[in-house]
């Protein structure tokens, strides 16, 4: 069954990766993009396969997710544009029942990490104070969205 949701999130670079990552739930993720405008993403998360369409937006985006089979995933994977992303996503509990999704990338993006936090409302997102291990906020920098990372790689530091 498909689901349509608004995704409200903030994204940060990582100043310091927390210790003892093995104590947190971790997903192995492989994803690629059939299109980046609009964003049409294929994702394998462990043994789960999802086709996602996202609207444009900065902090708030409409997201439509459709579970697909492994066979459908493999057939659609041939349509992926550019590079793919491989990452481990760690779910780290924060205060106020929030969860930090720490992504540590592999392959072409090795040694890169970022962290996202999803919120129930824009107000909650605005009021959020990131923990000390979070680095610079990049929510409004489209160069750090996964579609851009897949298409262009890491932004150059200027």
Which residue stretches match the model-derived regions?
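Phosphate-end processing signature that detects enzymes handling 5′-triphosphorylated RNA
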Residues: 1-158
